[in-house]
A protein has these predicted regions:
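Autoprocessing Asn-cyclization modules and mimics
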Residues: 88-159, 163, 181, 191-196, ...
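Enriched but not universal
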Residues: 1-17, 21, 470-482
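Conserved short beta-strand element of beta-propeller blades
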Residues: 19-49, 54, 67-90, 163-171, ...
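Short acidic/polar mixed-charge low-complexity motifs
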Residues: 53, 63, 127-131, 187, ...
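Short loop/turn segments that connect beta-strands within beta-propeller blades
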Residues: 58-62, 182-186, 305-309, 380-384, ...
Length: 482
């Protein structure tokens, strides 16, 4: 069944729908995290009421289910935050190691407790590298065996990823912990903590690859640590810290972090197992390995590597000119519709402020500074630098304690403290705009992300719902975004 979205602004009025209420009244630090990119077929929102009370909302059913307690270190409260990833984190990692296999079967040492049929699986190294399809079936319980179709053989050298979903959680307080909940195994795994007392406000920001590639092409030459496309005209280092994937031909399936680039050559951070050549095709994507953590009323920005389970305190070329305080935000911009590259792969200039800002999806984290200011700062992932206090349309209103936000396809939806107003920052229009009003009376004003997005896609058409909880209440609502 297909549909055509004929809803139009002004003609059709946005309207809230009441949903099944939150299982518990929210409190300081309580937050929502959702599969806003529809990477798993479940329409999931996670409600982290506190470190011990965590719930899953199924949009398809309008119902809640309690999940296992996190066991995370720290003291839940101001600054607690999280992020959803489409990749499963079985055992706390994205890349899984097969223990054996055969024709269309992969043996694992994981205890998978649910049916993963229909979930995407891709092989990243070893026997079967380049395989990218869906799971046909799996056994339940210890040492689960995964079955696929297509006639590919796997063995103990096979490394693979499953798009079964995971939720990453940064706690607050002294000795604040960091942990991940994996859906396939229904298990929490403690990860390396950032190692500081965390509070005030916080945003954990992922850079997932599986939205839309930012660029693609055919290789004209390859070497141990390089990939050349002589048809390109990239800006120097515009793709640094993104990842490149070989999608066809020699070396298919390999993924590497891009350490630098010239106009026509990508240099990767570690040598190829098989050098790409003129038969190879590639795509440039967001880097699956990284999370960024900002907030804590400090200019310091942290980056977490899933592969190494380590945190890096970044040293930007230009430091952020003001600390992100109460009411700050953080959004990875990867799908602005008007940020289209030129035919040679180079981006267009948005503003010459600082090091220059380019209309390039996947390059920037946008962050309203909060702290009762209206400053908008941008972190340039490629150049590891901040561009501070950038001008934008309708700049006036300040964001303060309990303002919070969620981003979706180039728009940032911002709850304006406990005013009831939800505004929108449009990347395409580069302007702060009004959007809607939540009529529910606020209880005690509290911190934490209270907005989430769930999209619906079918037959090439799509639309999305904005979900909202409010201050110290159990009410839960949604609105169709028009």
């Amino acid at each position: 069944m297909s549909f055509t979205n004929t809803l139009r602004k002004l003609v059709h009025r946005k309207s809230w729908e009441y949903l099944a209420p939150l299982p518990l009244v929210n409190a300081n630090g309580s937050f929502l995290v959702s599969d806003k990119n529809n990477l798993t077929p479940n329409s999931i929102i996670f409600y982290i009421s506190n470190a011990a009370s965590i719930f899953r909302y199924d949009g398809d059913e309008d119902s809640w289910l309690q999940l296992p307690t996190s066991g995370i270190a720290g003291a839940f409260g101001l600054g607690a935050c999280g992020e959803f990833r489409g990749l499963g984190a079985l055992g706390g990692v994205f890349e899984q190691v097969a223990t054996g296999g055969g024709l269309d079967t992969i043996n694992t040492n994981r205890t998978i407790v649910r049916n993963l049929a229909g979930r995407r699986i891709r092989v990243t190294s070893g026997l079967g590298i380049g395989f990218d399809s869906t799971i046909v079936s799996n056994t339940i319980g210890t040492n689960a065996i995964i079955t696929v179709s297509g006639g590919t053989t796997f063995d103990a050298t096979t490394r693979f990823q499953i798009f079964s979903g995971s939720m990453w959680f940064q706690n607050a307080g002294a000795s604040a912990g960091f942990a991940v909940y994996d859906i396939a195994t229904n298990t929490w795994t403690a990860k390396t903590a950032v190692g500081i007392t965390w509070g005030t406000e916080g945003y954990l920001i992922a850079t997932p690859s599986s939205i839309t590639p930012f660029a693609s092409g055919t290789v004209t030459a390859g070497a141990a640590t390089t990939l050349t496309d002589s048809t390109r005209g990239w800006l120097t280092n515009q793709w640094a810290n993104s990842q490149v994937r070989i999608t066809a031909g020699t070396g298919i399936g390999q993924i590497r972090t891009i350490s630098s680039n010239t106009a026509t050559v990508l240099t990767v951070s570690s040598a190829w197992t098989i050098n790409p050549d003129a038969t190879s095709e590639y795509s440039i994507e967001a880097n699956d390995d990284y999370f960024y953590l900002l907030g804590n009323n400090a200019v310091t920005l942290y980056r977490y590597s899933v592969t190494s389970n380590t945190w890096t305190t970044l040293s930007p070329g230009s430091v952020r000119s003001g600390a992100p305080g109460a009411g700050c935000s953080g959004a990875f911009i990867d799908s602005a519709s008007t940020w289209v590259l030129n035919s040679d792969g180079s981006p267009n200039l948005l503003t010459a402020t600082g090091a220059g800002v380019y209309k390039q999806n996947g390059r920037y984290i946008l962050s309203f500074r909060g702290g009762n200011t209206n400053a908008l700062d941008m972190y340039d992932i490629a150049l590891n630098t901040w561009i501070s206090s950038i001008e934008y349309g309708n700049r006036n209103e300040a964001f303060s304690t309990t303002a919070n936000s969620v981003d979706y396809k180039g728009d940032i939806y911002i709850m304006k403290e406990a005013t009831g107003r939800i505004n929108k920052f449009s990347v395409d229009d580069w302007a702060h705009k009004s959007f809607t009003f939540n009529p529910i009376p606020a209880g005690v004003n509290i911190s934490g992300v209270k907005l989430a997005i769930l999209p619906y896609e079918e037959g090439g058409e799509s639309f999305a719902y904005l979900y909202s909880m409010y201050h110290t209440r159990q009410d839960f609502l949604r609105m169709l975004i028009i």
